[in-house]
Amino acid sequence: MSKFSFNEQTCIGCGACVRICPKGLIHMDTDGPKMDEAASKRCNNCGQCVAFCPVKASMQEFSKGIELEDALIYDPRRAPTILKFIKSRRSERLYSPDPVPHDNLMRVLETANYAPSGGNNRTIRWIVFENPEKTAELREMIAEWFDTVCRTHPVYSKRYAIDSILERYRGGRDVILRGAPHVAYVVGPENAVWGPVDTGIALGFFNLACEALDIGCCFAGYATKAGEWEKVAQFIGLKPGEKVWCAICFGKKAAHAVRIPYRGKVPLTLL
């Protein structure tokens, strides 16, 4: 069965789907665009044919029965607001203890799911600590990782000020997860060529989606590295052959930025 079809009643035969397919899998036949079965085996459901059809005639088997949203049409009047929104994003280290509502969490994850990936292979998987009590367990487990594994680790024993971290943590200052009620891990196959890149892009989408709902984020390096420890890996539900690519902590903001700090000149070479 072909992964591509079209509405014969609305198709205008413009060939947009043919031109836009990244792999050239669609061709124009006498009665409209076609994707044969051999080509379908190479189709990775990227959705370009559906996205760019001007009359919404192109269809994917993959999204059959799903009501598709209209894309936001470019409007130059929105550009200043969108650019300022992106620049206004800050790493959040002060959180409300109240958990993020489930519906908002799912809106964020559904948006992050649209992040591009190498070859549209989409190999990453999300593990999200929605329950703050589970987050507290993870936090304590990371402290244990510092006090055991890190002390004898050839790199981490030198990289981290372990005694200082643990002293502040045990004194009531959460320098491990910054008091965040939630943590999200991005994991995937350990042999995924574009795993680190796909993860960075996905977390960028996640972070900006959070900002749209007044949720703050901070990349969680300690949680990421602790994911190498078998005890943490088992606790978060890592599957055989998977590895932790990165973690991010998040929650409702307890503080809001009022200005955008200067970042200096762009390090740049134009060729």
What is each PLM-predicted segment?
Residues 31-44:
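Short linker/helix segments within small regulatory modules
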Residues 128-199:
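Glycine/small-residue-rich phosphate/adenosyl-binding loop
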Residues 70-113:
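Extended interfacial segments that mediate partner engagement and assembly in macromolecular machines
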Residues 167-171, 243-271:
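C-terminal helix-cap and adjacent tail motif
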Residues 110-117, 124:
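Non-catalytic interaction/regulatory modules that flank or connect domains
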Residues 6, 16-32, 48-65:
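Iron-sulfur cluster-binding cysteine motifs and their immediate structural context
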Residues 12, 108-112, 182-184, 189-235, ...:
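Small-aliphatic-rich amphipathic alpha-helix that forms the alpha element of a beta-alpha
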